[in-house]
Amino acid sequence: MAKRRGQPLDGVLLLDKPVGLSSNHALQRAKRTLDAAKAGHTGTLDPFATGLLLCCMGRATKISGAMLNADKTYRATLQFGEETDSGDLTGNIVARAPEDFPGVEEANLREVLSRFQGSIEQIPPMYSALKRDGKPLYEYARAGIELERPPRRVMIYRIELLSFTGHQAEIDVACSKGTYIRTLAQDIGRALGCYAHLFALRRTQVGPFSLDRAVTLDALQAMTDPKAALLALNELPAGLLPAT
């Protein structure tokens, strides 16, 4: 029988996921660096996105359900003038504003953003991991098949304009589980009448955990003792771990 690889570590690593890696790839690199036997993450970030990825080791994987259901906070950059099939910069352009599009006026943008605060309905994107008949929607999308998706109600607790250039805007969004920031960007563009897609995304908070305490993969791999980056079980907020 093959020997089980890794050490039985327990704890949470707050990882600042770099651009270009899938969440699972980032998790596996962290797991190897820590030499952990068991690891899982608590919510996928797209490869183009960066920011807070909770990597749970050993018994800390028991918080995964709570963190999947937790509220999240993001910093998102919207690109105005073009809509893509995926809702982000990785997709194919499917609609464009006129060539003489002058950009968005700040007053209009602020007014539109205010409409998206509170309880809103979103239609999940085709490029998502939601399943239909056991198959992820993105597989249908890649085959050129568009399926009807019922809208889902989500909560936008805060949506704040951080910076603005006319053709791009950076916003801070605090939202409930199941919120698609790509869809939010697309819907904002449609409400403005000029189209938009998500140009960049950075997750800054998951439940009680903040990006402020996160470590990059490079920094983790450079540490003399990478295990020192783990939050121990007794450091986790009270009530997060289920009773044993």
From Swiss-Prot:
Tagged with keyword tRNA processing: yes
Record-linked Pfam families: TruB_C_2, TruB_N
GO biological process: mRNA pseudouridine synthesis; tRNA pseudouridine synthesis
Gene Ontology molecular-function annotations: RNA binding; tRNA pseudouridine(55) synthase activity
EC number from the UniProt entry: 5.4.99.25
Taxonomy, superkingdom: Bacteria
Catalytic activity line of the entry: uridine(55) in tRNA = pseudouridine(55) in tRNA
Top EC class, one word: isomerase
Active-site residues annotated for this sequence: D46
Keyword tags: Isomerase, tRNA processing
Protein's recorded name: tRNA pseudouridine synthase B
UniProt source species: Bordetella avium (strain 197N)
Family label: Belongs to the pseudouridine synthase TruB family. Type 1 subfamily.
InterPro entries listed in its UniProt record: PsdUridine_synth_cat_dom_sf, PsdUridine_synth_N, tRNA_psdUridine_synth_TruB, TruB_C
